[in-house]
Amino acid sequence: MATVENRPGHATHEVLNQASALEDYNVFESDRVLHAALHREGGGWAEGRAIEVGAFAGSAQAQMWGREANENPPCLRTHDRFGNRIDEVEFHPSWHKLLSVGVGFGLAALPWAEPQPGAHVARAAMFMCFGQAEAGVGCPLSMTYSVVPALRAQPELAAEWEPRFTSAAYDGERLRPAQDKAGALAGMAMTEKQGGSDVRANTTSAVPLNGGGPGGEYAITGHKWFCSAPMCDAFLVLAHAPGGLSCFLLPRFTPDGERNRMHLQRLKDKLGNRSNASSEVEFRGAWAQLVGEEGRGVPTIIEMVNHTRLDCVLGAATGMRVGVAQAINHCSGRATFGKLLVDQPLMQNVLADLAIESEAATIS
């Protein structure tokens, strides 16, 4: 790797011995382990797409967008300047640019939009490449990808919403009814303050409207301590119906075009994943539809959870790969004690250990 050339502008010193930025390279083509895994696991037909994603993710443009999205985190706007409740999250334009590209690549829908052997493998490889540009946008992409199998428990809801969730068009820069948009994104809200992962301890309630039942209407009242990607168009939520803990599809807008009674309380102050908004919410009689049977909420929503957990693993492996790539790039452009760091025996051992751990994470 080339080092940064000396540039004028410092009266006191010269800038020397600094590695160059790792950019304008192909993330996929430079990862022989991921390339081999894609072919070995049945996704080789998508190599061309993976190369395209890899070229974007490694580009200076994508890397800049990623930095900008993290340096300018999302901001919650509960009310407009006239005092009206709006419950919106504002993102830096780079967030929307990245998300638009990710949706266009099919990272939110490929296995459902183009079902064929190896489709999940292909998407996984592309997801890992894309995450090396910016990881936060992976949350709404993952949630949207994961909602489809759970939503299919209620065929009429799937018929209405699946075409929106599998669209290759991103239409999320402005909050408006999903029926007026070219594409939609999905989120999830399960956790409550008192229960955490013990969702059986949830207290949020669902009251049937017009009889309720599978696909029927309910009013949701309660809270969620963690709501993923709150600017999405619809969410799977858990609430206690008369028949027990149940799964519901809760959109940001009601069928008549009014904002649903889903009120964002605050955004989480997180250690990482800062470009992406995670929120606390309250439902005050919010309109929702039952997905599946009453009392079958956990088995229904677990279909979504399982797929998101796959992406959690992919995200961790992606982070490891980024760390290795950045470390090797730095050590290839910085010298110490008369040698490049990459040529120092002790550093070679460290880099080899990191590379082995990254390879193991990728293939497992």
What are the residue ranges of the model-derived segments?
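Extended, charge-enriched "interface" segments that sit outside catalytic cores
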Residues: 1-116
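A short core secondary-structure module
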Residues: 216-261
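A glycine-rich, basic-preceded beta-loop-alpha segment at the flavin cofactor/substrate interface
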Residues: 256-258, 265, 280-308, 325-343
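Internal helix-loop-helix
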Residues: 84-173, 228-229, 358, 362
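Short Gly/Pro-enriched turn/cap motifs at secondary-structure boundaries
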Residues: 194-197, 226-228, 240, 270-277
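Buried hydrophobic positions in well-ordered alpha/beta secondary-structure cores of metabolic enzymes
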Residues: 147, 188, 206, 220-222, ...
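Internal maturation/activation junctions in enzymes
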Residues: 157-204, 208-209, 213-216
